[in-house]
A protein has these predicted regions:
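Phosphate- and divalent-cation-binding pockets in alpha/beta enzyme and binding domains
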Residues: 13, 73-74
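Conserved small/polar residues in nucleotide/adenosyl-binding loops
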Residues: 87-93
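Phosphate/pyrophosphate-binding loops at sites that engage ATP/ADP/AMP, CoA/4′-phosphopantetheine
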Residues: 43-60
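Glycine-rich phosphate-binding loops at beta-strand->alpha-helix junctions
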Residues: 65-72
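Nucleotide and nucleotide-moiety/phosphate-recognizing core
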Residues: 80
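Short active-site oxyanion
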Residues: 1, 59-62
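Short glycine-rich, Thr/Ser-proximal phosphate-binding strand/loop in the N-terminal lobe
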Residues: 2-42
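A short helix->loop->beta-strand "cap" motif at the edges of active sites that frequently abuts
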Residues: 83-85
């Protein structure tokens, strides 16, 4: 599954994509002062509702888009926590 993160001015959309199909979509509030650890805790809440004990969510890679540069780095760090492969522009590295 690919983790898709779309950072907007009011919400951060998270999606799981497998075999070209959207498996789930969830939203979190965009908070410019939130740290990577705080965003990761919010993401854990989202993923815990979609996790099955015998079949955990595993991400093979991630893609991140953002119009909020203040938090792009924090969410890129979160994406790297869940997968070692992150597709983004050089601005987030």
């Amino acid at each position: 599954m690919i983790l898709a993160i779309d950072i907007g001015n009011t919400t951060v959309a998270l999606g799981g994509i497998r075999d070209g199909r959207v498996c789930f979509v969830a939203h979190m509030d965009t908070v410019r002062t939130r740290t990577a650890a705080e965003y990761r805790a919010e993401m854990e809440k989202v993923f815990s509702h979609r996790r099955h004990p015998e079949k955990p969510i595993r991400f093979e890679g991630a893609v991140l888009t953002s119009v909020v540069p203040q938090i792009t780095g924090a969410l890129a760090e979160c994406a790297r926590h869940y997968t070692c492969l992150l597709y983004t522009s050089d601005a987030a590295d």
